[in-house]
Amino acid sequence: MLSWCMKKIMLDESEMPKEWYNVLPDLPEPLPPPLHPATQEPVKPEDLEPIFPKGLIQQEMSGERWIRIPEDVREIYRIWRPTPLVRAERLEKALKTPARIYFKYEGASPPGSHKPNTAVAQAYYNAKEGVERLTTETGAGQWGSALCFATKLFEMACTVYMVKVSFMQKPYRRVMMETWGGEVIPSPSDRTEVGRKILAENPDTPGSLGIAISEAIEDAAKNENTKYSLGSVLNHVLLHQTVIGLETKAQLEKVDEKPDVLIGCVGGGSNFAGLTYPFVNDAKNGDLEIIAVEPAACPTLTAGEYKYDFGDVAGLTPLLKMYTLGHDFIPPPIHAGGLRYHGDAPTLCMLVKHGVIKARAVKQLPTFEAGLLFARTEGIIPAPETNHAVRAAIDEAIKARENNEEKVIVFGFSGHGLLDLQAYDDYLAGRLADT
């Protein structure tokens, strides 16, 4: 049943998606296979079993367009899903634009971001196969928070290697993870061989997602009843997130709207893919423009090289065909910690390579300027990562004003910034670098 006003477009719980969408069958060409780090041969399912459960490996390699969402997962999704699609009317008025701006609000989840969409699914499949503990990495802490939330619901333990600069910048993310029973370790650490090696070479390193991934994988591989879980990049992670875009499609249909522009921020690609992949065929047909926004300090899609590379610093992961800045790249310590990744999802990279998706990079200060305007018009404080999407949406709305076009702009609001207020304090005090 329709429950909406001009501000919010809502779906009933019964309208929540029953299947995830898998983009693999709709890519412009077959995806180059991941390669085994030791043999350089295509990875086989059994190669991944030391760190992933069989259920997720099957999803990773599935060619099926639609994958059923288990009812136990949908039951947990109902805690916060469906999420609202919101009309940003006050922002439109502030910009004096004829464009209509909508944002899909993923900050409604208990951890405050889109990340639980896959965290709950991954915890479910691991628990189903008897896994007792998960290890993972996290940048800004949103993914780590989501996995701690999910593992607690399935009575599992969780160890999170948090990039050191974010561990220092965002202490309340650590508190959130510990509240849900998680163990949080600043990375690099002395808990792993790779961590000790990096600390010996550079004791003052701010850390990176690539380093934290190496530590989490090493931990999982060396301990019984433990698997590794990740918050982005791989296809099974991205397909879990497509509940975002599938709901958005249904919500736009409720008000007879069709998007002209879809926008999302990009670190590894999960939030972006979740919103945009259900619309990929429309973009291939030229019916809309899809824009991926990344930080200029970590310009993977706009300045990276399209080639095989490791997903982590130590070279423990399979080699993935993607745009990459190099697996040993250490980005500047920007506040958008969730976007500080050297690579991107191979499916996203292929779509960028073929021109289905356009990429742009933005500097840090303009993103906070956009986030502040959004907070002062719409009332919600965006996460630093989300500010990248807000920036691009504002830029597109200004362009529509200049061209006098009534465009429909939809962007993904990946998470709120209530645990990122130090970043806003730094911005308001003039302490942020324009990297």
From Swiss-Prot:
CDD domains: Trp-synth_B. This is Tryptophan synthase beta chain 2. GO terms for cellular component: cytoplasm. Its EC number is 4.2.1.20. PANTHER family: TRYPTOPHAN SYNTHASE, TRYPTOPHAN SYNTHASE-RELATED. Pathway: Amino-acid biosynthesis; L-tryptophan biosynthesis; L-tryptophan from chorismate: step 5/5. Belongs to the TrpB family. Tetramer of two alpha and two beta chains. Keywords: Amino-acid biosynthesis, Aromatic amino acid biosynthesis, Lyase, Pyridoxal phosphate, Tryptophan biosynthesis. Its cofactor is pyridoxal 5'-phosphate. InterPro entries: Trp_synth_b-like (IPR006316), Trp_synth_b_CS (IPR006653), Trp_synth_beta (IPR006654), Trp_synth_beta/beta-like (IPR023026), TrpB-like_PALP (IPR001926), TrpB-like_PALP_sf (IPR036052). It comes from Archaeoglobus fulgidus (strain ATCC 49558 / DSM 4304 / JCM 9628 / NBRC 100126 / VC-16). The beta subunit is responsible for the synthesis of L-tryptophan from indole and L-serine. It catalyses: (1S,2R)-1-C-(indol-3-yl)glycerol 3-phosphate + L-serine = D-glyceraldehyde 3-phosphate + L-tryptophan + H2O. The modification N6-(pyridoxal phosphate)lysine is found at K115. The keyword Ligase does not apply. Pfam families: PALP (PF00291). GO terms for molecular function: L-serine hydro-lyase (adding indole, L-tryptophan-forming) activity; pyridoxal phosphate binding; tryptophan synthase activity. The gene is trpB2. Gene3D superfamilies: 3.40.50.1100.
